[in-house]
Amino acid sequence: MTSKRLGARFPGFLNRIGSGITRAARSDTTKRIPSAAGRAVERVAASEIGQRAIAGVVEGAATAALTGESVGESVKRAVILNVAGVHQTVPDPLNPVEIETQAKLRELDLANKREEAQIRHNKSMLQKEAQILGEVQHLMTVQEHVDQAKYEVRSGRALQAAQAIVKGERQQLDRVTKALIRENEMRTTDERKLIEGMRHNYSALAKSVDADSALIEEAVEQTVDIGGEIAEHATASIPFVGEAVSAGMATARGAMQIYRLGKTIHAITGLHTNHCEIPAIHQGAIETLLTSDSPTSDASLAQITSSRVRHLREIESELAHLDAEVKPAMQQMCQDIAKLAPDHLKKRRGVIHMNAAHELRVPLKQRPMIHSYTSPWDSDYVLILHVVGPYHSGQAFVFCLDLALDQFHFEEDTGSKPPVPPPRHRAPADFSARPAPISLSPLLAILTQRGCIGPGWPRVLMIRPCISALYRTRPPTRRC
C-alpha cells in the first residue's frame, strides 16, 4: 500500500520540477541575463583595458608566428604587458630601419630615466651634505668657543696650580725636616715610619753610588774627552767676554748631562722653564751621599731635605714671578697681536698664543741654565761656564777654569737683557768688574771642602755642587 502511494507521488514531483524549469527558462529575467552579459562583454571590449587585452592577443599571436615561440606564452606575455602599459609595439620584421629606430629609442628612454633618477639622487645627497656641513660648522664654532674658554682657564690657573704643587711638597718636606731635627723620643709614630722608610731608601741609593762610583767617573772622563775633541774640530770661534772661544754647547757637556734628572713643567708662557722642574733626586742628595761619612744619619737626611726645600723655595719664587710679571705681559701681547691679525685668525686663540710666544722668546744664551763652553785649543784644560740665574733673580756670572795655568776667572754678566720684565742680569749700582785672574788654589780648597773633587781630579765635572759653592763663596768684587 505504501509503495503504491510513493509510485504515484514521484511522477507528480518530477512534473512540478519540469514545469518550474520551463517557467524559469521562459521568464523575462532569464532573457535579460544573456543580453546583460553581452552588453558587459561589449563594454569590456570597447574599454581601454579591453582594447589592450585584444591587442595583446593579436600581438602575441603575431609574435609567435614570427619568432616560432609558444602561442600560449607569447599571448599571455603580450596581454599582461599590454594591460600593464609597458609593452612595446612589435616592429615590422621586414623593416630593419624601424627595428633599429625602436632599439635606439628604447636606449634613449632608459638613459633618460637613469639620468633623471641620478639627478633626483644627487639632489637628495646635496641636501644631506648641506645639512651635515651646517652641523659641522656649528660644531666648529662651538669648538672655537670651548678652546678659547680652555685657553683662558689654562692661562689663568696653570701657574697657580704649579705653585700649589711646589708649595705642597715644600710644606711636606718642612715637616720631614722638623721631624729629623727632633729627638727620636719626641717623634710621632707616623714620623718614625716616614724617617725609617727614608733612611732605608737612601741607604740603598748610597750603596749603588758607592758600587758604581768608579764607572761613573770613567764615563764622565770619556764624555769630557769626546766633548773636547768635538769642540776643537767642529765648532766655530765667536767673541765671548773678550776672548775667542767655540760656539756655545747649549746644554752642559760632561757629567751635567748624566746628572740631569727630573721633568719639565708645562710651558704656558712660551719661555724656557726647564729650570722649574722638581727633580726626582736632588743634587744635594747626591752631594751628601758622595761626601758624607754616614749618609743615612739623621743629620745627613736633614741636610738632604733642607737642600731640597731651598730648591723648592727658589722654584716657588720663580713661578710667582712668572705669574705676576710674565703672564700679564703675555696677555697684553696676545691682545696686541689679535688687533693686527687678519679677521679669520682673530678668534683662533692657538695661533695668537703661538705668535705671542715667539715674541716673548728668550734667546738660548740668556735662558736660566749652566751654559758650558770649551775653547778650540787646550780643551782638556780650559772650561768656561756661563751660569744664568732664574728669571726672578736677575743675576748671571761667567766662571772660567784653566787647569794648565792653575787659575780661574770670575766675572758678573751685565750685558744680557732679554725682553722679559724685569730686565735681568744687571749688577748693583756700585759694581764695576775687570778681568782678575786668581790662583786656582782657593778654588781647589773650596771644591775639596765641598767634596766635589778628590785625588787626580776625578770628580771635577760634578759641576752643579761646584757652582753652588762658588756662588755662595765667590771672591770679592774689585773696583776699577
UniProtKB/Swiss-Prot annotation:
GO molecular-function terms, A-Z: structural molecule activity
Pfam families: Orbi_VP5
Keyword NAD part of the UniProt annotation: no
Keywords assigned: Capsid protein, Outer capsid protein, Viral penetration into host cytoplasm, Viral penetration via permeabilization of host membrane, Virion, Virus entry into host cell
Superkingdom of origin organism: Viruses
Subcellular location as annotated: Virion
Principal localisation: virion
InterPro entries xrefs: Capsid_VP5_Orbivir
An individual GO BP term: symbiont entry into host cell via permeabilization of host membrane
Renumbered residue ranges of the record's region Involved in membrane permeabilization: 1-48
GO cellular component term of the entry, any: viral outer capsid
Family per record: Belongs to the orbivirus VP5 family.
Function in brief: VP5 protein is one of the two proteins (with VP2) which constitute the virus particle outer capsid. Acts as a membrane permeabilization protein that mediates release of viral particles from endosomal compartments into the cytoplasm. Permeabilization activity is probably negatively regulated by VP2 and is triggered by endosomal degradation of VP2 and exposure to low pH.
The protein's name in its UniProt record: Outer capsid protein VP5
Gene from which the chain derives: Segment-6
